[in-house]
Swiss-Prot record:
UniProt xrefs under InterPro entries: AH/BAR_dom_sf, AH_dom, Arfaptin_fam
Domain AH per the UniProt entry, residue ranges: 91-291
MF GO annotations: phospholipid binding; protein domain specific binding
Domain of life: Eukaryota
GO terms classed as biological process: intracellular protein transport; IRE1-mediated unfolded protein response; regulation of Arp2/3 complex-mediated actin nucleation
Region (Disordered): 1-42
Any one GO cellular component localisation term in the record: mitochondrion
Name this protein carries in UniProt: Uncharacterized protein F54C8.7
Biased composition (Polar residues): 23-40
Compositionally biased spans, kind Pro residues: 8-17
Annotated PANTHER family: ARFAPTIN (PTHR12141:SF5), ARFAPTIN-RELATED (PTHR12141)
Length: 307
């Protein structure tokens, strides 16, 4: 052995057919930009018939309509924001707006009545079922307990009658709920829709009115702008639309005030009779109330005429 260490032998190259052999670039192989590769790409793309048959005029009209809608929505939103900030004036009818606010509050309170009545009806339904089950359980007990059979039978009959009365009151209450839902969800809501449409028409009118005012009476130091063709006529048309909708809303509110009171008062009388009969234990009067309601027709969707 010598003191020097021999260096490790250099690894030999793997055979050419080995999978570990390095890949050599063949100049004759096609490159990414070669003619062979490009020949695989189609020279032309066929346009589908659906795309080829598109009516460009119709598309342009829809785009123009969408453009007008976008501009109008932006102007209306800007008008509402400036009104809220107190930086622009708006058309005001204090009496009409006060009536609208009163109706909105009445509508909210009717909603509370409907929700509470539905909750009461749910409780009555559960109570009637519980009373019937208790009646049945006492009857089953009377079949086995001969010594207290009379007491069990009497209690069973009492609970059965109480359960039937609860079911009868629930039937009267459900008719009352149906009538109140008609007033709440249809009659008052129909009038509120007219009020909301009136408010939208008022905003559109104020947008054009303020645009005309800003163009004809610019701030000091600014030049007068030319109005678009037909701007004044368009503003007058929107004013007429607003006035018509406001008049329709006033008529509907007046008719609603006249008819709502009479309809709701009649329903309250029927409900009061049913409640008095139930809590006084007058089963015959309660049954009479149920029979009376069964002969009544369903309330009309609305007693406000369509305008």
């Amino acid at each position: 052995m010598t003191g020097s260490t021999a260096s490790p032998p250099e690894p030999s190259a793997p055979p050419a057919d080995s999978p570990f052999a390095p890949v050599t670039q063949n100049d004759s192989s096609p490159t990414s930009d070669s003619t062979e590769t490009m020949s695989r790409i189609p020279t032309g793309i066929k346009v589908p018939d659906v795309v080829a048959n598109i009516d460009t005029a119709q598309v342009a009209a829809k785009v123009e309509s969408f453009k007008k809608w976008t501009i109008g929505t932006f102007k209306n939103s800007k008008q509402q924001l400036l009104e809220h900030m107190g930086k622009i004036d708006k058309t005001v009818d204090p009496e009409f707006e006060a009536q609208c606010e009163v109706l909105k509050d009445i509508h909210r309170r009717y909603g509370l009545v409907v929700a509470a009545a539905k909750n009461f009806s749910h409780v009555l339904t559960q109570m009637a079922e519980a009373e019937k089950k208790l009646s049945e359980s006492f009857y089953q007990l009377s079949m086995k307990e001969e010594q207290i059979k009379a007491q069990c039978t009497m209690t069973s009959e009492t609970m059965r009658g109480v359960g039937e009365q609860a079911a009868s009151l629930d039937a009267c209450l459900r008719y009352f709920i149906s009538s109140m839902e008609t007033v709440y969800n249809q009659t008052i809501t129909d009038t509120l829709h007219t009020i909301y449409n009136t408010e939208s028409a008022r905003i559109e009118y104020d947008v054009d009115r303020n645009d005309i005012s800003a163009a004809t009476n610019p701030p000091q130091g600014q030049l007068t702008k030319n109005l678009p063709v037909g701007a004044t006529e368009k503003c007058e048309e929107k004013k007429a639309k607003y006035e018509k909708l406001k008049n329709d809303a006033k008529i509907k509110m007046r008719l609603l005030e006249e008819n709502r009171i009479s309809v709701v008062a009649a329903q309250l009388e029927k409900l009061q009779s049913a409640l008095a009969a139930y809590y006084s234990g007058n089963a015959k009067l309660l049954e009479a109330s149920v029979r009376e309601l069964s002969f009544l027709q369903s309330p009309q969707p609305s007693f406000i005429p369509t305008m």
